[in-house]
């Protein structure tokens, strides 16, 4: 279907409706004027998912395992986001680039014209049978420790709010917004993980309107760290490294 795209100037309306607003009668998609190019692409792809893949998405969210309207709404958003990531960063080509670049998130973001956060989220979904990538878990938190996004390709689970160790490197990222930080961490069950974290800012734009800051992080079991540029120079074999 033909959809017209417009950069919206109705900021107050968009603040209520989110980063995009679709008018099905006029077939017009309005995007927040302060979105970066990569963010605009992602929002367009997510809306395309809701239009072109509406039937399969509806089938999936009708699963009885989703017990409430809220759960079904979140699943619908998650499926649209997965569609958008797959459209912008096709599985085979993106996995090949990730392996060739040692999963360097910043290089992957520049090569594909998307954000650091989009790359992190896509990396956490590369688990196709037969051709899997590194099994990452992805998380986005605010300064208070509230988790606003999470995705896991493993059995690692997060609490939704609070209770996170203050020594977790993810929180240090807020004090070093332009740096990618790494950390080896050992869990109470003895399992060890490599964490990669960076502070990202969502700009609302203009004087007196500071952007919202989040810390975005990827983690993986330490046995996969040798495949990543972030594992270079770390004492991965030392029992006390974490």
Language-model-detected regions and their locations in the chain:
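Conserved binding/catalytic microenvironments
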Residues: 2-242
């Amino acid at each position: 279907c033909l959809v017209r795209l417009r950069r919206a100037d109705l900021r107050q309306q968009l603040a209520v409706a989110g980063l995009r607003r679709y008018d099905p009668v006029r077939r017009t998609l309005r995007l927040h004027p302060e979105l970066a190019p990569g963010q605009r692409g992602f929002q367009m792809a997510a809306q395309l998912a809701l239009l072109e893949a509406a039937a399969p998405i509806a089938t999936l969210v009708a699963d009885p395992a989703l017990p409430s309207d809220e759960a079904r709404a979140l699943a619908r958003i998650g499926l649209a986001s997965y569609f958008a990531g797959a459209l912008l960063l096709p599985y085979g080509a993106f996995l090949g680039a990730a392996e060739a670049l040692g999963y360097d998130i910043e290089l992957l973001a520049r090569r594909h014209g998307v954000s650091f956060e989009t790359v992190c989220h896509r990396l956490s979904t590369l688990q196709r049978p037969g051709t899997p990538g590194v099994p990452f878990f992805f998380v986005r938190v605010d300064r208070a420790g509230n988790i606003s996004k999470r995705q896991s390709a493993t059995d690692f689970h997060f609490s939704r709010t609070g209770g996170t160790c203050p020594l977790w490197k993810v929180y240090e990222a807020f004090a070093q917004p332009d740096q990618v930080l790494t950390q080896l961490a050992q869990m109470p069950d003895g399992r060890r993980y490599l964490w990669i974290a960076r502070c990202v800012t969502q700009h609302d734009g203009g004087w007196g309107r500071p952007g919202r800051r989040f810390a975005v992080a990827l983690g993986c079991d330490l046995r996969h760290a040798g495949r990543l540029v972030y594992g270079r120079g770390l004492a991965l074999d030392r029992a006390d490294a974490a």
